[in-house]
Amino acid sequence: MLEHFCECYFNLSGLILCPVLGSIILLFIPNSRIRLIRLIGLCASLITFLYSLVLWIQFDSSTAKFQFVESLRWLPYENINFYLGIDGISLFFVILTTFLIPICILVGWSGMRSYGKEYIIAFLICEFLMIAVFCMLDLLLFYVFFESVLIPMFIIIGVWGSRQRKIKAAYQFFLYTLLGSLFMLLAILLILFQTGTTDLQILLTTEFSERRQIFLWIAFFASFAVKVPMVPVHIWLPEAHVEAPTAGSVILAGILLKFGTYGFLRFSIPMFPEATLCFTPFIYTLSAIAIIYTSLTTLRQIDLKKIIAYSSVAHMNLVTIGMFSLNIQGIGGSILLMLSHGLVSSALFLCVGVLYDRHKTRLVRYYGGLVSTMPNFSTIFFFFTLANMSLPGTSSFIGEFLILVGAFQRNSLVATLAALGMILGAAYSLWLYNRVVSGNLKPDFLHKFSDLNGREVFIFIPFLVGVVWMGVYPKVFLDCMHTSVSNLVQHGKFH
């Protein structure tokens, strides 16, 4: 009875509409009703999260087929539909999205009086668009939602950013990502003219010539590489992180950086397998250079957010190495590392936000000796520093381990360079923790710092649980994605 009820009333369109309905309700609430605005925004995001958990419970991990499929005709004169569905690859990205949005609303809880209801509406609309990206099975509509996310993120950075350069950072973020995606739009139009459809399921059975695959692969790569981001098109990310509010950085690191790698997994690799094999050495070279370069660059940074931002670039390029190993271990490890990065990097940005809220600076030189005045914060910061180093027992370890296993099967030199990047990652993580928490207490202002309050501790608890769960028992996550990953490898005949 309960199973039948869930099948009838829990679907992807309902999941997508939850944050939209919350936004519509907020439009009719005056800004003076701050408590009601907070409550409605938080309830809408929590309902969406619980909704996604119900879909996880209903998900059948034994099949590689898309599940909870819905289709609605969008353009009557073309085979373009509002086509939704998820599989083992996209399921956890949807859950990660719905998990982080309530956190973002709680982060801005105390500043809601100055932010206004528009702040919550922006994040709810962003959630709607991001869920649609991970659920969309129509190529053209995927592009529409893929690019539409830029609008609320542009507003979040440009309006609620923390410094004077926030407008420049917002425009840089917008233009970099938009210009890169124009090539993908041209490729989608070419596919539509050649095949008469943008339906992913049909396109997966369509065989393109090798020459056409190479052209289309390059066009998609131009879009996805900016989102990862890969070197040298990574310049927008550190600036966007520095200028974005704390919640904006959580969305950037936790979700938006996954768009590019998800795009590779969902479209580039299965649709253009011959071109993927052709360009794998190029991806390996670019990713290995990016890992070493950004890891060394991180050691030279003096801004806390830039350190974590460059660390994110290194981790996401490790993900691309795993994906393009084109085997089950590498791809499974890359998905697991993306989920882990969504938790760990978000938590680290929240830690920086805690410090910034208290002294309005992110420069490393102003901090030191916090263990004596903020022991609870220091403990939590230490835990997520260890997770960022991929300590065994934390969520990042098994993902990076599987990536190295997969990469060694494909190219031992690249795998060795990736392992070197992990060592550098441990170096800059420990350096950051030592500078901020250890040493002598700065007498000017740090003695005035208060430790974490109840709301901040409550925000960190779900991240602690998630990181430990994924680190201690990753089988739950790997089992759900295994069939879909195996099907991807077999479809491309990569094994």
Swiss-Prot record:
It comes from the Eukaryota. The lineage of its organism: Eukaryota, Viridiplantae, Streptophyta, Embryophyta, Tracheophyta. GO terms for cellular component: mitochondrial inner membrane; plastid; respiratory chain complex I. GO terms for molecular function: NADH dehydrogenase (ubiquinone) activity; ubiquinone binding. Keywords: Electron transport, Membrane, Mitochondrion, Mitochondrion inner membrane, NAD, Respiratory chain, Translocase, Transmembrane, Transmembrane helix, Transport, Ubiquinone. It catalyses: a ubiquinone + NADH + 5 H(+)(in) = a ubiquinol + NAD(+) + 4 H(+)(out). NCBIfam families: NDH_I_M (TIGR01972), PRK05846.1-3 (NF004499). The gene is ND4. The chain crosses the membrane at residues 9-29, 39-59, 89-109, 118-138, 173-193, 214-234, 245-265, 272-292, 335-355, 367-387, 413-433, 457-477. GO terms for biological process: aerobic respiration; ATP synthesis coupled electron transport; electron transport coupled proton transport. This is NADH-ubiquinone oxidoreductase chain 4. Its EC number is 7.1.1.2. Pfam families: Proton_antipo_M. It comes from Arabidopsis thaliana (Mouse-ear cress). Its main location: mitochondrion.
